[in-house]
A protein has these predicted regions:
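Hydrophobic alpha-helical segments
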Residues: 1-153
């Protein structure tokens, strides 16, 4: 896989500055950082963004996330390792990431309403939208994850 463009950050600098400002706001939001990491990794898995998976798994581990929970994240529905709050966030992540298929079901929203305050509901939805923007940019430009020293067997 070859990158399609390597200087896209410079070519759309004002847009990327706004995206980085959004990330700073999300960091300061009332959402727990480990929950946001789970959301970012799960959306990135669905979108097939190796660059973002690599980044957000690394950040989650650095912030103290358990490696087993990250390994099982794609199968979260079949694991007891995720709290009801995390399960609501992950279901909402999948619903919004796959919105053309799911149409953001009312039952997923009801779980979000039950687990999160109104402020957190807004921030969670923004966090999901933000990672989907990043995924589409990185996948679209075929950004290479930095683990290039590893090779396929």
């Amino acid at each position: 896989m070859s990158p399609r463009m390597t200087d896209y950050f410079k070519r759309a600098e004002p847009a990327f500055k706004a995206m980085f400002s959004l990330e700073a706001a999300l960091t300061a939001s009332p959402l727990d950082a480990l929950l946001v990491h789970l959301v970012k990794v799960r959306a990135s898995q669905i979108n097939g963004c190796a660059y973002c998976i690599h980044m957000h798994v690394g950040e989650a581990l650095k912030d103290g996330e358990d490696p087993t929970r990250l390994h099982l994240l794609a199968g979260w529905r079949d694991s007891s390792l995720y709290s009801p709050r995390e399960r609501a966030a992950l279901a909402w992540t999948e619903a919004l990431t796959l919105v053309a298929e799911t149409h953001a079901p009312d039952e997923d929203w009801a779980a979000v309403e039950a687990a999160f305050t109104p402020d957190e509901q807004a921030w969670l939805t923004i966090a999901i939208g933000a990672i989907n923007i990043w995924n589409r940019v990185q996948v679209g430009f075929r950004a290479e994850h930095p683990a290039t020293q590893l090779h396929a067997a």
